[in-house]
Amino acid sequence: MRKIILASGSPRRKELLELASVPFEIVVSEVEETIGAYSSPSDIVMSLALQKASAVAENNSDHIVLGADTIVTYESRILGKPSNEDEAKEMLQLLSGKTHEVYTGVAIIAKEKTVTFYERTEVTFWELTEEEIDTYVASKEPLDKAGSYGIQGKGSIFVQNIQGDYYSVVGLPIARLVRELKQFDIDVTHA
């Protein structure tokens, strides 16, 4: 029987697959992520998700491989994971009191076909004080997250409004993924 392999070490993606009762194994993609000249954030996340999944699929061609990538954008500026605490603070100051977009791309690779898709979610932050930002960054939570915040953690208190898929902001649009997996004869809704 074919296995589902998650090409990611993200604990959040692992938790979401477990939440949906999707049986899977983890093989972390060691691919060097490269962003070419893409026209849109959706193209970027789908390309990065495909790069990750393709790298793992090379050695797992009999299985179904999932790759995913998430970025945050604000006024056409891409906000990935911060490289240090100062950059995290800058990102949070930029997002304070404003609406930004979160894009998560997913790639599903199997022998018979490859499917890519993305979800776009708008997130609005409350106005943040310098003290709130400093305290949050000192917690280290934002340092491994696109846009420097975790909506499922302490960063949740910054969110005033969300339009779209909450789980996509966490890192994996799980409801859409479950539906897309049906194309590969995987139906966890009847498990």
UniProtKB/Swiss-Prot annotation:
Keyword line: Cytoplasm, Hydrolase, Nucleotide metabolism
Keyword hit for Cytoplasm: yes
Site entry: Important for substrate specificity: 12, 70, 152
Pfam families xrefs: Maf
InterPro entries the record matches: ITPase-like_fam, Maf-like
Catalysed conversion reaction: dTTP + H2O = dTMP + diphosphate + H(+); UTP + H2O = UMP + diphosphate + H(+)
Cofactors that this protein relies on: a divalent metal cation
Catalytic center residues: 69
Subcellular location: Cytoplasm
GO process terms (BP): nucleotide metabolic process
Molecular function in Gene Ontology: dTTP diphosphatase activity; UTP diphosphatase activity
Family: Belongs to the Maf family. YhdE subfamily.
Function recorded in the entry: Nucleoside triphosphate pyrophosphatase that hydrolyzes dTTP and UTP. May have a dual role in cell division arrest and in preventing the incorporation of modified nucleotides into cellular nucleic acids.
UniProt-recorded name of the protein: dTTP/UTP pyrophosphatase
Organism from which the protein derives: Bacillus cereus (strain B4264)
